[in-house]
């Protein structure tokens, strides 16, 4: 997601291009504040270095993303005190009709996502979406003889219960 955002006017990637830093109008990479469903998160990437906000691998599962909003000025009061910008990620709810899922196999990791209604007895008011992701960079690095062994597991989940037409309860983790 950050690679797409980096292509917008006034934004640039980090020098070297291997990190997911977002530099807004010349500000430092750690001056951008990230929110996931209106909860501030300090870092959205694995393997970040001091003074940066981006490592080479994102932590947020793209299967969960419903909407991304970037604000580069005139921040609302709900965003505390960002210096360069605010990047807000909104997660989607699980499928209300049936259980489904996907499996992704990438260059550095593989992931599985499962979603659906909890039960038909509550008229599909409660949905879930869960995923797990595992890197296999450590095996690739070992094969080519590199001394480092980067390794990570990601688990992400969201449960949504629709209380009425205007209210819902979300549990994320």
Residues of each region from the PLM?
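Transmembrane beta-barrel wall of Gram-negative outer-membrane proteins
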Residues: 106-136, 145-173
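Periplasmic N-terminal accessory/gating domains of Gram-negative outer-membrane beta-barrel systems
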Residues: 1-76, 86-93
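Outer-envelope beta-barrel architecture signal
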Residues: 30-32, 64, 97-101, 122-128, ...
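Short sequence motifs at beta-strands and strand-loop junctions characteristic
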Residues: 14-16, 62, 79, 104-106, ...
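Flexible, solvent-exposed coil segments and beta strand-coil junctions
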Residues: 66-67, 85-97, 133-140, 150
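Transmembrane beta-barrel architecture of outer-membrane proteins
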Residues: 6, 19, 55, 65, ...
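Outer-membrane beta-barrel architecture
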Residues: 3, 23, 86-88, 102, ...
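Extracellular loop and loop/strand-boundary signature of outer-membrane beta-barrel proteins
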Residues: 53, 98-100, 140-147
């Amino acid at each position: 997601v950050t690679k797409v955002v980096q292509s917008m006017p006034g934004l640039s990637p980090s020098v070297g291009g291997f990190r997911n830093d977002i530099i807004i109008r010349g500000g430092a990479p750690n001056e951008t504040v990230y929110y996931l469903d209106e909860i501030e998160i300090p870092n959205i990437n694995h393997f970040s270095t001091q003074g940066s906000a981006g490592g080479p691998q994102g932590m947020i599962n793209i299967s969960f993303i419903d909407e991304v909003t970037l604000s580069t000025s005139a921040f609302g009061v709900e965003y505390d005190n960002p210096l360069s910008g605010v990047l807000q990620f909104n997660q989607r709810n699980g499928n209300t009709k049936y259980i489904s899922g996907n499996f992704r196999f990438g260059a550095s990791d593989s992931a599985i996502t499962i979603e659906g209604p909890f039960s038909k007895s509550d008229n599909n008011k409660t949905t879930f979406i869960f995923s797990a992701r595992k890197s296999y960079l450590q095996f690739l690095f070992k094969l080519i003889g590199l001394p480092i062994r980067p390794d990570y597991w990601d688990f992400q989940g969201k449960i949504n219960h629709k209380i009425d037409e205007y209210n819902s309860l979300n549990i994320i983790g």
